[in-house]
């Protein structure tokens, strides 16, 4: 016979029918009316014991986080939690701060202008405002009865205010360090390294370090070593870790190359002195043995021992995420090697096995190896001793190297090189939260070298917006892109050498898209409109990639871009008009990471980037090394206009996109 069904717990009802209900669950099998009656009694007793207060009163801290009912059901997971973006797509707002320690934090003194950098009122003023509002009983509310709050900035991208985690005193300290080393002559570099700077910067009349170089070079040379605590001083044998976080186009490559080469040459001098002392010692021992041999006629002669020399043992390893960066960093290292006298070996998967073998296992040896993590990790598996003498490991574009695709091979190289490693240097223009957390756990004592303009797009870069939905485009992004390029290159199109007009330099424009398939489509459309455009993506032929980037990186600006024989044929032009002296590359994020496009003045964002990280890297291809630049966003149907608006406002104020 079935008993009365209750609404308290259906699982308990099933257990009761089977006769297996535990004692702890027996109170849950009560009638629903009985449970409801007991809940009303408890609620009444609680209300009688607590004083009455306004229902909608909230503190400033809770006001910034409204209840879940106000947010709506949009963007919630099945478990009831808010859907959050992955940490690899969110910039970290505490890059300059080391991880929290168990020690009591030191009390920070009040700076003379410290109150100007505050983004929230002091707690005393907050309590005073709450007291006044409760006294007059006139809280500011909206029509629906909720308390009215000031809209937080950067709501669309979930950002925060500029330099919220970098106090005024920290920024003053960084600027003071930059003033101390405003010239390379003030840095204690070797004479050969000082002379090599002229070869690396031939186009600059006044060679002065950038903010990233002023902060990083002295620290990497050991001039500003941090005072280690008792906990860290007990650790012995670990490498000294550095994080160089600086904006795009700030000269990070030269910032880590100069101290590394200085350390390599000093180590060579020390080894040379030790070798001379050892040779003198061996000569003395040989003379003593020769004297003993004359007296002892039965002494046996010792055979000559030939010491095996393995040339594939570099002293420094530079890891980069792409083959294009291998060629770029290798070119900078080659320009320094003529004066400093060291051997650099840039290797990538685009090279043949014979070329890689000749680069690494050269009889003359190798000092610096520039490679991608997967290639070097595969070589280290077959030749484990290749990382046995590495003292400096540099991870350029660390946010990409410690992402899901490169992290296994990067960590494998780091583990193999740790026994002999002295310095670990991580460089990046963007520090996502996942990387910041990983470094805090793996290297808690890491020295963080952060410039004041981290995660900010330079103010010398202007951002314009083209609304594709309006006339005359009517939602056609291809037409809007072609028209924008024609407006940029119109001044160069008027150049006619027959009429004796002044020559206009060739304008180079980068067009960024989100999908790899769109590169070919957009490039074909631009070519049909008389624009010299090429597609650049991962599947592009390696020889064609080198020719395409040669003119845009400044390595070969005198020659024009020529299509390789394997390139697809250009379509028939829709009209006889062609845009002269203008070169365009349509690319994905492959062309936005680390490539030094010094000759690019204009960047067009065909698609709105997914994250602020992509915004920083794409717009960072222009306005490099103190030059001016311009970025143009094509805002089409379905794009986030609020995101573009907030990025534009942040760029106008010079704030960080965090």
Curated annotation (Swiss-Prot):
Residues 25-37, 552-562 have a biased composition (Polar residues). It is an enzyme of class 3 (hydrolase). A motif (DEAD box) lies at residues 396-399. Transmembrane segments: none annotated. Residues 490-658 form the Helicase C-terminal domain. GO terms for molecular function: ATP binding; ATP hydrolysis activity; RNA binding; RNA helicase activity. Residues 233-449 form the Helicase ATP-binding domain. Residues 25-150, 268-292, 552-573 are annotated as: Disordered. ATP binds at residues 246-253. CDD domains: DEADc_MRH4. Residues 1-32 form a transit peptide. GO terms for cellular component: mitochondrion; nucleolus. Residues 125-150, 279-292 have a biased composition (Basic and acidic residues). It holds the Pfam family DEAD. Belongs to the DEAD box helicase family. MRH4 subfamily. The Q motif is unique to and characteristic of the DEAD box family of RNA helicases and controls ATP binding and hydrolysis. This is ATP-dependent RNA helicase MRH4, mitochondrial. It comes from Phaeosphaeria nodorum (strain SN15 / ATCC MYA-4574 / FGSC 10173) (Glume blotch fungus). The gene is MRH4.
